[in-house]
Amino acid sequence: VRLLLDDNNTPGLDDILRLLDSHPRIEVRLFNPFSFRLLRPLGYITDFSRLNRRMHNKSFTVDGVVTLVGGRNIGDAYFGAGEEPLFSDLDVMAIGPVVEDVADDFARYWYCKSVSPLQQVLDVPEGEMADRIELPASWHNDAMTHRYLRKMESSPFINHLVDGTLPLIWAKTRLLSDDPAKGEGKAKRHSLLPQRLFDIMGSPSERIDIISSYFVPTRAGVAQLLRMVRKG
């Protein structure tokens, strides 16, 4: 299991990340990690230009067969698994050639210069962690976990998935992603998503459907969309 996380949202998780990374079949890496682990705001004072560049890409790919991409973060609030309010978001599940494209894009980020193996950021003493790999018994008996599992087992989506009857929409699909060099501030403008999206949109004759968790097109993007509207 390769887990690549943006380090911006990991405060207080260092021990958990150490534990995960100590497992022989799990490797954790961090995008643009903070040098100051406790007083993180100090990092913005001393290294703002680098730390202000974050990674919003989200993908979950299994065995090169199926992938999930979308806006959902890793957290109970995004899956209706906790007592806190539900954060609604969307994912796309895909099979076919695009899965390899997503895996290749993950590899681009996994090996880019802005990403560091966890062991370069945190000390991971193997001997100390070896005794903690076993999950606490309380995790297996957690009432909230069992409620969530029961919901999953009764979900029509899960039943369709298990039975191989999940209705799929077959379509031509293309993956677009920012150049990971943006983490160093070295990405060319034409290699970033806004320009590439408009290039692909071209001159549509009827309609464009855009689904986004937070769509921030900037002034130039708004102007481009308005030009399309005026053209009908």
PLM region spans:
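Charged, low-complexity intrinsically disordered terminal segments
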Residues: V1-K58, V62-G232
